[in-house]
Structure formats: structure tokens, C-alpha cells
């Protein structure tokens, strides 16, 4: 079965995601990754990065280039959670190196406390 949407519809769907995360926060955590939207229990928050307001999807793609942030705790970044400006769950995604297929791409996934985390790149697209 094949189902293809018009580019305008694909972009509109991504704009819903952009609106939900605009002005929110991306927090990178240690393992284990919880179930979708589940409470954080044993995971440690390594860094919190502000997401700018006013994000715009274009051509069925939404790309985030987030500002440099200071790492709070030293450890391996395994996954990240995006929350809205009102601290509601938006999305979870995996962390990986720049050349990986991970949602949150980093120069290194091992983060050192007090170091500056160079911009994080995240890309979302509608097939």
C-alpha cells in the first residue's frame, strides 16, 4: 500500500510539531530511555537547551540548530526529550554523532561537565 500527501499537507503537519516545541526545551539524558512521554526516573539530565520561539517548517522539513549550552553533568548522552514552553511532553529522540541517523546529532555523545556543548542539530521531515 502506498499513500502520498501533498507537500503543503506534509509541511503543515511539521508546522504542528514546530508550534509545539517553539519556546520549549531540549534536555539530553543518560540511559535508559523511558516509554514515550513517561516520567523521568533514574535518568540523569546532562544539559538543557532552549528552543527558540517562532519555528517554521518549510518544504516538509523542520531543522533546529540550537545555541551553545553548558553541560551540567558528565556522562553519555543517549536520548533527548523536547518539552513545550509550558513544560508539556512533545517528543523523545535518540542522540548520535553528526554522521549518524539519530534525531539529535552531536560532535560527541560523551559530555563533560562545565564544557560548552557546541550547537545541536536536529532535523525532522515528512516522507
Model-assigned labels for residue ranges:
Residues 1-78, 84-127:
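Small cysteine-rich, disulfide-bonded extracellular modules of the LU/uPAR three-finger superfamily
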Amino acid at each position: 500500500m502506498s499513500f502520498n500527501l501533498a507537500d503543503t499537507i506534509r509541511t503543515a503537519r511539521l508546522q504542528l510539531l514546530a508550534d509545539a516545541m517553539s519556546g520549549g526545551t531540549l534536555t539530553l539524558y543518560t540511559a535508559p530511555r523511558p516509554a514515550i512521554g513517561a516520567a523521568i526516573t533514574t535518568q540523569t539530565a546532562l544539559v538543557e537547551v532552549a528552543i527558540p520561539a517562532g519555528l517554521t517548517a518549510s518544504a516538509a522539513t523542520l531543522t533546529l540548530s540550537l545555541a551553545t549550552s553548558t553541560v551540567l553533568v558528565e556522562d553519555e548522552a543517549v536520548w533527548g526529550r523536547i518539552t513545550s514552553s509550558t513544560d508539556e511532553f512533545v517528543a523523545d529522540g535518540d542522540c548520535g554523532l553528526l554522521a549518524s541517523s539519530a534525531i539529535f546529532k552531536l560532535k560527541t555523545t560523551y559530555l563533560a561537565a562545565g564544557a560548552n556543548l557546541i550547537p545541536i542539530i536536529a532535523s525532522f521531515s515528512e516522507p
